[in-house]
Amino acid sequence: MSPVWAADEAPEAFIQRITHETLETIKADKSLRNGDMTKIIQLVDAKLMPHVNFRRMTALATGPAWRKATPEQQKRLQDEFKILLVRTYSGALSQVSDQMVVVKPLRAGQENKNLVVSTEVRGKGDPIQLDYRLEKTPGEGAGWMIFDLNVLGVWLIENYRTQFTKEINAGGIDALVASLAARNKTNAKAP
């Protein structure tokens, strides 16, 4: 896909494309279908993560403390948060079998810097509401970037912001980074 096409892609088409490509890749690969976490993490990193604005996501989740953090603290926090999110999303994808994603029409009047695309994941059981908050990026490599997710009515940023604020208030940014690193280390050992 050329960057020009990506820049002109409608937000619903963007979400439909990346979710469809990811689900089809899983359905076509037996080791992915069987929950091979190493391969699923590689898939998430290759197919989804290039479309996520981790800097904005981390800054929003961290709140006012983000602006007070040094560039090194910001980088470490962003790196650890990315690992956590990749593992979380990969864990959800390891459960994929016959699901399909239905992208709902956009609500009118949304702006390109904070636009919500609503989807429904359908398969066995009740459908799961999954919304993506997007921003349009300008310039070279322009296109849509995800900076928040809403799963079953809970926005990811709000959820982590509550957790992060408690950790920052208790021990500062370094304590939050250490906590995320410890959680990531524990999660890496889990099957």
Describe every region a protein language model picked out.
Residues 16, 23-25, 78, 102, ...:
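Soluble periplasmic/extracytoplasmic beta-strand elements of cell-envelope proteins
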Residues 66, 83-84, 108, 122-124, ...:
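Solvent-exposed loop/turn segments at secondary-structure junctions
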Residues 87-128, 183-191:
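Surface-exposed, charged secondary-structure patches
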Residues 8-89:
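Early exported N-terminus immediately downstream of N-terminal targeting peptides
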Residues 127-159:
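Short beta-strand edge/turn micro-motifs at domain boundaries
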Residues 148-191:
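Low-complexity, intrinsically disordered terminal/linker segments enriched in charged
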Residues 2-7:
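Sec/Tat signal peptide C-region and signal peptidase I cleavage site
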